[in-house]
């Protein structure tokens, strides 16, 4: 680094040209915006982030989802016969909900694996198995290691993450961004609900390639479009929720 310029070299002192990735985040996104803490702000951002998660991804005419970032041909998607979700913490719980949706709607068996345990077994990857790595940051160490183990065994690995240009986004064969914006609060809120929304889209896409009718696909799209508004209505009951919390927050059990 000099006063006028900078250069990047490898460990062997070979100069390289960096790939510059522009991040579409503004300063407002990392400020509390009048809320007492980031967690509350991020809870109230959910109607907006849920809309962002489905923006441009719903195809009402065909009753399906549009997820070109998966980088898979129609035939590849049609021949998926097993899905593995690799995740940790909150992302693992999102995977559990995704498991229910995909198995019920698309009839594809799904396994949700703790990433920290997956690579210490001898996981069996067969033809037709697709692995999804789910991580808000895209940098979760255990998920990255498990994902690389799956790739080593020949799996097609896709990512579901939030941070553009993160390690998972770069190292996977394709994927879907959740578009939740920066999440500062330690307890995940908007990233979790956006992950579930994206998993709903994946479920819809796979189901329409199998046994879900056009009519049912359009119904699902209508329900997905209504979710942000319903979340908004629930958040408007903040004062009622506070009153109930005041009644019960000192209780030891229910």
Describe every region a protein language model picked out:
Residues 63-69, 111-117, 157-158, 236-239:
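Short gly/ser/thr-rich secondary-structure transition/capping motifs
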Residues 2-48, 55-60, 64-66, 174-178, ...:
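Terminal amphipathic helices with adjacent charged low-complexity linkers/tails
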Residues 226-243:
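Accessory alpha-helical/coil subdomains and C-terminal extensions
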Residues 39, 69-74, 87, 120-122, ...:
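Generic recognition of flexible, low-complexity loop/linker segments
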Residues 53, 65-82, 124-126, 243-252:
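Glycine-rich phosphate/diphosphate-binding loops that line cofactor/substrate pockets in enzymes
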Residues 78-212, 218, 222-226:
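Glycine-rich phosphate-binding loops that contact phosphosugars or nucleotide phosphates
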Residues 35-39, 49-50, 89-98:
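Conserved phosphate/anionic-ligand binding catalytic regions in large, soluble enzymes, centered on
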Residues 37-39, 81-89, 249-254:
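Glycine-rich phosphate/diphosphate-binding loops and the adjacent beta-loop-alpha structural elements
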């Amino acid at each position: 680094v000099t006063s006028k310029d900078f250069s990047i070299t490898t460990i062997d002192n070979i100069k390289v040209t960096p790939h510059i990735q522009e991040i579409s985040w503004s300063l407002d996104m990392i400020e509390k915006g009048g809320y007492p803490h980031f967690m509350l702000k991020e809870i109230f951002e959910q109607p907006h982030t849920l809309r962002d998660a489905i923006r441009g991804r719903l195809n009402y005419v065909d009753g399906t989802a549009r997820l070109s970032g998966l980088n898979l041909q129609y035939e590849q998607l049609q021949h998926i016969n097993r899905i593995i979700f690799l995740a940790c913490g909150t992302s693992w719980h999102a995977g559990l909900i995704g498991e229910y949706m995909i198995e019920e709607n698309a009839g594809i068996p799904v396994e949700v694996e703790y990433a920290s345990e997956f690579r210490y077994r001898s996981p069996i990857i067969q033809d037709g198995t697709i692995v999804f790595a789910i991580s808000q940051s895209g940098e979760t160490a255990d998920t990255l290691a498990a994902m690389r183990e799956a790739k080593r065994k020949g799996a097609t690995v896709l990512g579901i993450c939030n941070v553009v240009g993160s390690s998972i986004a770069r190292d996977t064969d394709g994927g879907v961004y959740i578009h939740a914006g920066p999440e500062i609060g330690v307890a995940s809120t908007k990233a979790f609900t956006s992950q579930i929304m994206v998993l709903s889209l994946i479920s819809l896409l796979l189901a329409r390639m199998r046994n879900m009718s056009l009519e049912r696909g359009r119904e699902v799209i209508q329900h997905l479009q209504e979710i942000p508004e319903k979340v908004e209505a629930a958040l408007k009951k903040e004062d009622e929720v506070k009153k109930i919390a005041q009644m019960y927050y000192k209780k030891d059990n229910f």
